[in-house]
């Protein structure tokens, strides 16, 4: 039995010819269909305001993914909030930290990132313990990070800024 059509649960790449699935489709003469199963969407401004979190009252933002970065800055733009230059950003990986360049001027003294491990990430946050943190999360999320930060008794506000939906 040979497969003639293959479903890939990712969005269609910008350049299909550079996709690894293109070579497979040419080699095995199969048709490739791209359809993402889950799409992450930022919460509305009304839902964000119902959380009663003042963005400008914080001095540092903790990001764990690119989608939370997009959602955070989208909410700031929608609420007409100008994020101050003095805001510090703590990211779980370097990829997320570099993604911040899309929204802010990248300066090493205000952007910190871990190597992706949980312990390194917590150590990085402890280094900046005098800051007032805002943890940007998507729903659902793993409870380890908020629980660990609560045990450390840091000044912390949790905000839920994105949630998954099923595309039509």
Where are these regions (language model features)?
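Conserved beta-alpha
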Residues: 1-162, 166
């Amino acid at each position: 039995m040979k497969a003639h059509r293959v479903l890939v649960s990712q969005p269609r790449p910008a350049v299909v010819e550079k996709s690894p699935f293109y070579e497979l489709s040419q080699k095995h003469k199969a048709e490739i269909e791209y359809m993402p199963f889950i799409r992450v969407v930022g919460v509305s401004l009304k839902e964000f305001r119902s959380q009663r979190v003042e963005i400008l009252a914080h001095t540092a933002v903790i990001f764990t993914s690119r989608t939370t970065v997009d959602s955070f800055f989208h909410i700031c733009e929608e609420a007409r909030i100008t994020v101050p230059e003095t805001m510090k950003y703590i990211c779980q990986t370097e990829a997320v930290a570099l993604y911040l360049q899309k929204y802010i001027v990248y300066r090493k003294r205000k952007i910190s990132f871990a190597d992706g491990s949980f312990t390194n990430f917590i150590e990085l946050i402890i280094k900046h313990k005098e800051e007032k943190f805002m943890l940007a999360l998507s729903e659902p999320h793993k409870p380890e990070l908020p629980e660990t930060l609560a045990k450390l008794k840091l000044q912390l506000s949790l905000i839920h800024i994105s949630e998954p939906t099923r595309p039509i």
